[in-house]
């Protein structure tokens, strides 16, 4: 029963907020006040679940038609898709095939501006969600029953998480703690960092013990892991590092009831909310269901966006052919790209006889270009890449970004169950998104120990052991660490943050294909380590100032 708790409540939650009279505006974060006497009674359970649902849905009617955010592309404006795009598309992990799409070239080349719409989408989404959290907290102020106290702690956690995204992406936030028409004030750097830290400390006692919460709700381990993430990045956010606390809180998570999943791929399959092996690692998932939570963000984006028609075992009837691996990502598993299993140039792809998964598999197997061949060649179960002929002949790298087969396909996210049973929908995935998982604590502790001059090999090798990696690390280097973050967490919506922390996102310390718009990569101005405050909010909120470097 616990595993389905959040999904069962989603339907009611999707209508709870609008029926309460909440509105939003694309051009600023002004909101209309709620009068519970005219807007209907406060549905505490519905609004509470909506607080979690906003992580994975975009409105009140599923795919589209009644969006949270008026005036925006509903499919593009969800929490996960907007944060994912800003943290993945500019990095060494992936490319977007269709460079003519709005603002995509700017993300690819790290050249965005305050007028970029995709920057505005994530900014407004984070602000909208915080508005809903403030509404819930105002409505439940003074209530002292145990369940309400726990719900309030969880909503405060989600609000702190959103403020962390503001801090990480923008270096500041339009800050409010109450639901009102007052303009948000600017809170940035150390001040915002301290606020998030204090919030997490204050709410910890009222949260579930690790692994005691219904699957999909935040517990103390989620709190500790967000704190570990905050402390690991303290040098970026405040100018003062705090690796000792990062190590301390990562160790608390590792010492809790969570355990590593023994099969890496099962973490990203459609039954990761029922398969105990996967669930034991997933600390906080974004709940997804092919029937109840249909949307164009979330795991639909991750599965459909990485597939093209003709690929074997797509897991969806709708391949969008959008996201593929950069060569730099492939190099995390193959330092020499000549070792990547690829179809020889002199082998023609048959024009007939490749109509079924079985036929494509047979051809791929004959030439050693299946995903299982990739894993074997890499000596690492995490190398979930596809170089076969399903959907066309692929390249490893390209001199012009013109289509989906300009790089290897990433098949990490799947709409297949580990037990072989059917999924709930042929197009929209059931796959939950592990927003927080235990492996992050291992790499956080490894990096924190390394930064303090200690031996970090144990934690890295623990993850490599799980991945059946044939190469164990003997000596940890900074490059080995940043590469390991990619091997473990590629396409999970965090890469930019790691690169910024390592001083590699904008500098020539590390170049990758198409960084800065150059085929072989080039450095960019350091102010791109932060996103700009959207010009719309600068114009509408006199309290907000633009980040340095942007005009």
Swiss-Prot record:
<keyword id="KW-0564">Palmitate</keyword>
<comment type="subunit">
    <text>Interacts with SusC.</text>
</comment>
<keyword id="KW-0472">Membrane</keyword>
<feature type="binding site">
    <location>
        <position position="320"/>
    </location>
    <ligand>
        <name>D-glucose</name>
    </ligand>
</feature>
<dbReference type="Pfam" id="PF07980">
    <property type="entry name" value="SusD_RagB"/>
</dbReference>
<comment type="function">
    <text>Major starch-binding protein present at the surface of the cell. Mediates starch-binding before starch transport in the periplasm for degradation.</text>
</comment>
<keyword id="KW-0119">Carbohydrate metabolism</keyword>
<feature type="binding site">
    <location>
        <begin position="73"/>
        <end position="75"/>
    </location>
    <ligand>
        <name>D-glucose</name>
    </ligand>
</feature>
<dbReference type="GO" id="GO:0005983">
    <property type="term" value="P:starch catabolic process"/>
</dbReference>
<feature type="lipid moiety-binding region" description="N-palmitoyl cysteine">
    <location>
        <position position="25"/>
    </location>
</feature>
<comment type="pathway">
    <text>Glycan degradation; starch degradation.</text>
</comment>
<dbReference type="InterPro" id="IPR011990">
    <property type="entry name" value="TPR-like_helical_dom_sf"/>
</dbReference>
<keyword id="KW-0998">Cell outer membrane</keyword>
<feature type="binding site">
    <location>
        <position position="81"/>
    </location>
    <ligand>
        <name>D-glucose</name>
    </ligand>
</feature>
<feature type="binding site">
    <location>
        <position position="432"/>
    </location>
    <ligand>
        <name>Ca(2+)</name>
    </ligand>
</feature>
<feature type="binding site">
    <location>
        <position position="430"/>
    </location>
    <ligand>
        <name>Ca(2+)</name>
    </ligand>
</feature>
<keyword id="KW-0479">Metal-binding</keyword>
<protein>
    <recommendedName>
        <fullName>Starch-binding protein SusD</fullName>
    </recommendedName>
</protein>
<dbReference type="InterPro" id="IPR012944">
    <property type="entry name" value="SusD_RagB_dom"/>
</dbReference>
<feature type="binding site">
    <location>
        <begin position="98"/>
        <end position="101"/>
    </location>
    <ligand>
        <name>D-glucose</name>
    </ligand>
</feature>
<feature type="binding site">
    <location>
        <position position="288"/>
    </location>
    <ligand>
        <name>Ca(2+)</name>
    </ligand>
</feature>
<dbReference type="GO" id="GO:0005509">
    <property type="term" value="F:calcium ion binding"/>
</dbReference>
<keyword id="KW-0106">Calcium</keyword>
<feature type="binding site">
    <location>
        <position position="296"/>
    </location>
    <ligand>
        <name>D-glucose</name>
    </ligand>
</feature>
<keyword id="KW-0732">Signal</keyword>
<dbReference type="GO" id="GO:0019867">
    <property type="term" value="C:outer membrane"/>
</dbReference>
<feature type="binding site">
    <location>
        <position position="273"/>
    </location>
    <ligand>
        <name>Ca(2+)</name>
    </ligand>
</feature>
<keyword id="KW-0449">Lipoprotein</keyword>
<comment type="similarity">
    <text>Belongs to the SusD family.</text>
</comment>
<dbReference type="GO" id="GO:0009279">
    <property type="term" value="C:cell outer membrane"/>
</dbReference>
<feature type="lipid moiety-binding region" description="S-diacylglycerol cysteine">
    <location>
        <position position="25"/>
    </location>
</feature>
<dbReference type="GO" id="GO:2001070">
    <property type="term" value="F:starch binding"/>
</dbReference>
<dbReference type="GO" id="GO:0042802">
    <property type="term" value="F:identical protein binding"/>
</dbReference>
<feature type="signal peptide">
    <location>
        <begin position="1"/>
        <end position="24"/>
    </location>
</feature>
<dbReference type="GO" id="GO:0005982">
    <property type="term" value="P:starch metabolic process"/>
</dbReference>
């Amino acid at each position: 029963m616990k595993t389905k708790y959040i999904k069962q409540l989603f339907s009611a939650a999707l209508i709870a907020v609008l029926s309460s009279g909440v509105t939003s505006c694309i051009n600023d974060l002004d909101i209309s006040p709620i009068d519970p006497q005219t807007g209907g009674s406060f549905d505490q359970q519905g609004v509470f679940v909506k607080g979690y649902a906003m992580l994975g849905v975009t409105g009140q009617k599923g795919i589209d038609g009644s969006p949270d955010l008026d005036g925006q592309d509903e499919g593009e404006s969800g929490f996960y898709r907007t944060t994912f795009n800003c943290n993945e598309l500019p990095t060494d992990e992936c490319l977007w095939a269709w460079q003519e799409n709005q603002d995509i070239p700017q993300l690819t080349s790290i050249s965005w501006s305050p007028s970029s719409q995709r920057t505005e989408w994530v900014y407004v989404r984070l602000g909208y969600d915080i508005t809903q959290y403030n509404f819930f907290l105002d409505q439940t102020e003074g209530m002292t029953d145990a369940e309400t106290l726990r719900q309030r702690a969880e909503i405060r956690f989600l609000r702190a998480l959103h403020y962390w995204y503001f801090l990480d992406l923008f270096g500041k936030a339009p800050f409010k703690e109450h639901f009102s028409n007052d303009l948000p004030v600017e809170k940035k750097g150390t001040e915002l960092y301290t606020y998030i830290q204090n919030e997490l400390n204050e709410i910890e006692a009222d949260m579930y013990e690790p692994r005691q919460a219904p699957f999909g709700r935040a517990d103390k381990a989620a709190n500790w892991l967000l704190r570990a993430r905050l402390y690991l990045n303290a040098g970026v956010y405040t100018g003062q590092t705090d690796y000792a606390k990062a190590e301390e809180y990562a160790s608390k998570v590792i010492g809790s009831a969570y355990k590593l999943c023994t099969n890496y791929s099962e973490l990203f399959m459609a039954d990761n909310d029922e398969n105990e092996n996967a669930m034991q690692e997933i600390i906080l998932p974004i709940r997804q269901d092919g029937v109840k939570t249909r949307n164009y963000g979330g795991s639909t984006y991750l599965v459909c966006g990485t597939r093209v028609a003709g690929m074997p075992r797509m897991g969806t009837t709708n391949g969008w052919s959008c996201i593929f691996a950069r060569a730099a990502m492939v190099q995390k598993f193959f330092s020499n790209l000549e070792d990547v299993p690829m179809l020889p140039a002199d082998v023609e792809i048959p024009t007939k006889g490749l109509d079924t998964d079985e036929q494509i598999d047979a051809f791929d197997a004959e030439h050693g270009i299946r995903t299982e061949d990739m894993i074997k060649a890499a000596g690492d179960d995490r190398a979930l890449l596809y170089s076969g002929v399903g959907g066309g002949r692929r390249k490893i790298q390209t001199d012009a970004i013109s289509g989906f087969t300009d790089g290897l396909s990433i098949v990490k996210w799947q709409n297949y169950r580990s037990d072989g049973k059917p999924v709930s929908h042929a197009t929209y995935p059931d796959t939950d998104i592990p927003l927080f998982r235990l492996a992050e604590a291992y790499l956080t502790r490894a990096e924190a120990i390394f930064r303090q001059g200690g031996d970090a090999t144990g934690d890295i090798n623990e993850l490599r052991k799980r991945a059946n990696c044939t190469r164990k690390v003997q000596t940890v280097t900074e490059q080995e660490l940043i590469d390991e973050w990619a091997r473990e967490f590629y396409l999970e919506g965090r890469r930019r943050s790691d690169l910024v922390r390592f001083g590699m996102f904008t500098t020539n310390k590390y170049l990758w294909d198409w960084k800065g718009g150059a085929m072989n990569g080039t450095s960019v101005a350091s102010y791109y380590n932060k996103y700009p405050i959207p010009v719309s909010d600068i114009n509408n909120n006199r309290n907000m100032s633009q980040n340095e470097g942007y005009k």
